[in-house]
From Swiss-Prot:
Organism name: Arabidopsis thaliana (Mouse-ear cress)
Domain F-box stretches: 1-46
Name used for this protein in its record: Putative F-box protein At1g58090
Superkingdom of the organism of origin: Eukaryota
One Pfam family per UniProt: FBA_1
C-alpha cells in the first residue's frame, strides 16, 4: 500500500507550530521541507508561535533553559549551547533580537559577534566600536525588509551641556558610523532603571525622572528614527514605588507582542505583575497603552530581586492557568534558581550547572538569521 502525501499547505500548517529546535533537525528529511524552513513567511509564523526560554551566560558557558508548563508538575531542561569563543574572549551579552544573541568583548582588541544558537556555525563578526559603552541590537521595522543595526552610545557632560557620541553599525554596509550630538541638561532627567527587552526591532527599558516624581516609564530606543531622536519615553508604568530604591522593577515581553512589568517591594517581598491589554504594534507611540493586573505573589520566603542583570522572568496564561517563571541568583550558596508559580504551586529548581555569577535574559528561539 502506497502512503499518501499530505498537501504542502497542510504540512506547513502543522510544521509552523513545531519548535524551531526540532525543525532544524528535520531539514534533511526532504528538499521541500528544507526550502520551506528558509521561507520568510514560514519563519515569521513559526517565531510568533515560539515558547520563551531563559538564557544564562557565565564566564565560560551559555545555557538555555526551557520550561515545560503543560502538566501539574512543571519541569525544566537545561542545554549547553556550546559557544566555543566564549571562554577565551570574555564575551558579555548586550542584547537579543529575533532569537539572535549580540555579544561583545573588550578583551584582545575588542569586538562583537551576532549568532543564532540554532545555527552555531553561522556567526556574524562585528568590528570594535570606539568610544562607546552601551550597545544594543535592533532593526528598522518601518521598511519592507528588516534593516538590522547596532547602536552604541556614550555621553560626556561639561558646563551644563551633554555631548552624546553615537556609533551605528549597519549590517548592510558592515561598518560603524560615528556622530556627535550636543544637548543641554534636561530637567527632569530620565534615568535608566532596569534591563532591556526587544520588541518590533526597538529596545525598551524601565526608567524614572530625576528629581523623582513618583512616576515610572517605559523608555525606548527607536531604530527607525534619526539617531538624535531615537531615545524617548514610550508610556507610563502602573508601578507605585514612592522612591526608586524601595522597589525593583523588571520589564519582559508577554505573548510575543505585549509588555509585562514586575514590581517587587524590598520590604514585604510582595510581587505585582501587570501586562498590557493590547498588542504593541510597530510604530505605536504608547499613548493608548492600557495595563491590567496579571498576578500578585505574596510569599515571605520569596527571594529579594536586586540585580536585573542576572534576573529575568516571563508569564503565561493558558488552559493550565496563569504561570510565572522567574530566574534569579542566590548569594549563599552562589547558584542560579528557577521559580515556577501557578495557583498554589511554587516550585523552586536549582540549576546545577551554574555555580558562579551570570547574566540572564528571556528569549524565543527562532529560525531567523541576521545576514
Amino acid at each position: 500500500m502506497v502512503s499518501k502525501k499530505l498537501p504542502l499547505d497542510l504540512e506547513e500548517e502543522i510544521l509552523f507550530r513545531v519548535p524551531p529546535r526540532s525543525l532544524v533537525r528535520f531539514r534533511s528529511v526532504c528538499r521541500e521541507w528544507n526550502t520551506l524552513f528558509k521561507n520568510k513567511r514560514f519563519i515569521n509564523k513559526n517565531f510568533a508561535c515560539g515558547r520563551p526560554e531563559i538564557m544564562l551566560n557565565t564566564h565560560s558557558h551559555i545555557y538555555s533553559i526551557s520550561v515545560d508548563l503543560k502538566d501539574e508538575n512543571p519541569t525544566i531542561k537545561v542545554r549547553d549551547l556550546r559557544f566555543d569563543h566564549l571562554s577565551c574572549r570574555g564575551y558579555h551579552l548586550y542584547g537579543i533580537c529575533d532569537g539572535n544573541f549580540f555579544m561583545y568583548s573588550f578583551l584582545n582588541g575588542g569586538g562583537g559577534v551576532v549568532w543564532n544558537p540554532l545555527f552555531w556555525r553561522q556567526t556574524k563578526w562585528i568590528a570594535k566600536a570606539e568610544n562607546t559603552c552601551g550597545k544594543a541590537i535592533g532593526y528598522d521595522g518601518s521598511r519592507p525588509e528588516k534593516s538590522y543595526k547596532i547602536i552604541g552610545r556614550s555621553s560626556c557632560s561639561w558646563q551644563g551641556k551633554v555631548t552624546d557620541t553615537y556609533s551605528v553599525f549597519e549590517f548592510a554596509t558592515n561598518a560603524w558610523k560615528v556622530t556627535d550630538h550636543t544637548r543641554f541638561h534636561e530637567k527632569p532627567e530620565l534615568m535608566d532603571d532596569s534591563g532591556r527587552v526587544s520588541l518590533n526591532g526597538n529596545l525598551y527599558w524601565t526608567a524614572y525622572n530625576s528629581p523623582h516624581t513618583g512616576q515610572y516609564f517605559i523608555a525606548m530606543l527607536d531604530f527607525s528614527k534619526e539617531i538624535e531622536k531615537s531615545r524617548k519615553t514610550f508610556c507610563v508604568l502602573p508601578c507605585k514605588g514612592e522612591k526608586s530604591t524601595t522597589h525593583t522593577r523588571i520589564l519582559s515581553i508577554y505573548k510575543g507582542d505585549r509588555f509585562s512589568v514586575l514590581e517587587q517591594s524590598k520590604k514585604t517581598r510582595e510581587i505585582e505583575i501587570w501586562v498590557t491589554k493590547d498588542q504593541i504594534g510597530n510604530g505605536d507611540d504608547g499613548d493608548d497603552v492600557v495595563w491590567i493586573k496579571f498576578m500578585t505573589v505574596s510569599r515571605p520566603d520569596f527571594p529579594i530581586l536586586l540585580s536585573y542583570i542576572s534576573t529575568s522572568y516571563f508569564v503565561d496564561n493558558d488552559i493550565h492557568g496563569k504561570s510565572f517563571v522567574l530566574c534569579c541568583p542566590s548569594k549563599r550558596p552562589k547558584a542560579a534558581w528557577v521559580y515556577i508559580v501557578r495557583g498554589d504551586l511554587c516550585k523552586k529548581i536549582k540549576i546545577d550547572q551554574v555555580l558562579c555569577e551570570f547574566q540572564s535574559s528571556v528569549y524565543v528561539p527562532s529560525l531567523i538569521t541576521i545576514p
